[in-house]
Amino acid sequence: MKINHIAIAVPDLEAALLFYRDGLGLPVQEVDTVDREGVKIAFLPVGDSHIELVQPIRVDTGIAKWLTKHGAGMHHLCLEVSDIDAMLANLATKGIELINPQAIQRDNGIRYAFIHPRSAFGVLVELYEVRSAACT
């Protein structure tokens, strides 16, 4: 297990890139729109991990609601696991509250699921199973 990325919710991806890419000098590895989630994302590698910038593209998304309530800032911590199905099953048997009891697959082959902050001491935790070279 390792930290895959730390996600930061932003209202304007381009404005955020002015700081992270142009100011800090972090390279942009990937920019993608995830229609299912209603977000535009950018991954910027930092050592063996990434910063993920997440901008809502619709007002009815979880990220848009989060930004309205909290403003821009850290949204979640993502842990990379080798077998997400086994991890989710193990967490469920321990009574851990899962937002996604089953993994969701992105177009690039990455499978992910979220653990509810109530079970993770206030932190939204995402689990990632990377089956391709994306974001690693």
Region annotations inferred by a language model:
Residues 1-15, 72-81, 133-136:
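N-terminal beta-strand motif that seeds the catalytic metal site of vicinal oxygen chelate
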Residues 2-4, 26-36, 58-75, 94-111, ...:
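A cross-kingdom feature marking solvent-exposed beta-strand/loop segments within repeated
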Residues 3, 17-20, 44, 51-54, ...:
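Short, structured motif recognition centered on aromatic/hydrophobic residues
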Residues 11, 45-47, 118:
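Short strand-coil-strand connectors
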Residues 14-27, 91-94:
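Amphipathic alpha-helical segments
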Residues 34-50:
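C-terminal "cap" of GNAT-fold acetyltransferases
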Residues 42-43, 79, 88-136:
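Vicinal oxygen chelate
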Residues 47-51, 58-60, 84:
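Short, charged/polar surface micro-motifs in flexible loops or helix N-caps
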